[in-house]
Amino acid sequence: MIFDVNGEYARALTPLANGNGIGVSHVVLDGTAAEGRFRLPHWFLEQSEWELLLQASERTQVPILRMALGLSTLFSGGNAQELNGIKNHILATCLSQILRDDSGSPSKHDRMVGLLQRFNTQQINNPTIAQFIRINFGQMANPQGLTNYLLGGAQGGGFIIDGLKMPTYKSLPFEFSALGEALDLAILYEEAHGNRQIRDYCSQMITRFKSLEERAEYAFLRHDLQGGGHDPSMGTFLSQLLGLVQNDANWVKRNQLIIIDMNSVEDEVVELVASVLARMSFRLLRQADPRNRFPVHLLLEEAHRYVASTPSRYAIDASRVFERIAKEGRKYGLFLLVASQRPSELSKTVLSQCSNFVIHRIQNPDDLSHIRQMTPFISDAVLKRLPSLPKQHALVFGTSVNLPTTFKVRDADPLPASDDARIRDLWFHEQGRAAQVLIGVAPIQQAGAGDVFD
């Protein structure tokens, strides 16, 4: 599986599918939800990935987010009765808390009306409680009647659920917008227990969620189930991801190479997609029986952009999952091939687990020093040659090579889309000469599409 962040590999590798018995799948991620593009259903994200994506703080925001994700499971699962019961429980708890407040009746009335304008159910809404909370001469008409209606009396009834346990997140399909409603319910439930400041504490997380809901580059993550959006199962998605098709009771390999073209998206999207796909692949191979019988290689192009030694400034820190794969992946048949121009910026944990190295020309002193620390058995004479290595030449060393060796890489045919600009030929353009370049063409008009996980 190739994480192609520069859109280079399809031109070179797609022809391998022509009569060679090597299936090649080329999928394009451009951030849109257009037909034929890569899609990643948002419910495939784990709870910890949601926490990172929304940058939820551990002490206040994470508990609210976990409760909201659990509620989102009810939004999706068709269990309308259970969801309505929890909503009634939360509203009844909130209204009861307001009744016990020391403020005056007019203030309590206004707070209840405002609350039920935002959140209400068929059983608890402004019309159903109006008879209890109307103000007569500065006093609420029938507060005890409202208490009996909400909490029940000697004859039973009421909406409070004793010993209620909030549902846990189960990665079931749900509308992306439903998480926003679930966050509001979770905050409301916390407010009902006296935490008046929780909404302010969670305001940044809510803002980040609304940003994800609106940003065009995250359209690939948002699935519209009500609008007829395709609802892939995780098994179907993973089988396509690993190039498998089912033939009766057996899995058959269809594609040997899966190229995920991420040239059209920014680093934060690359980091999110790479992290989630790597984690899903790792989990699948850990659960495979027998283990270690289906090796998978992840080729991480420009790895310093999302497997960095320092925490990411974006939401998802992909280094975590790749560090675990680097340490444990060999037990399950998952391996990393890390390609980077800046080895000094890569995760030290990932680099420490690499057993073979192919090093092209490197001139940066920090990178040279880093290589020296990684490979103490290489002589200074060999390292001094690295800044002056010709194009297509590299130094190879590691467990697969008896002695560090410099070699020339054979010409690729066909070449990847990574040619250097011919500055000498293209710098000067006579007036009126055609530029021979298309400007402003959207990625969806340029790229081809192969199998798509949508």
Could you say what each language-model-derived stretch is?
Residues 1-31, 40, 396, 428-429, ...:
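Glycine-rich phosphate-binding loop of nucleotide-binding enzymes
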Residues 121-124, 139, 143, 152, ...:
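Conserved P-loop NTPase motor module
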Residues 21-24, 257, 334:
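Short, conserved active-site loop motifs that form the nucleotide-linked donor/cofactor pocket
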Residues 2, 28, 208, 258-261, ...:
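Structured core elements
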Residues 26-32, 40, 44, 357-366:
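Conserved AAA+ ATPase "SRH/arginine-finger" region at the nucleotide-binding site
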Residues 2, 7-17, 39-324:
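P-loop NTPase motor domains
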Residues 56, 317-410:
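Conserved ATP-driven motor cores of ASCE-family P-loop NTPases powering translocation/secretion/packaging/pilus
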Residues 6-10, 33, 264-266, 304-305, ...:
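Conserved nucleotide-binding/hydrolysis micro-motifs of P-loop NTPases
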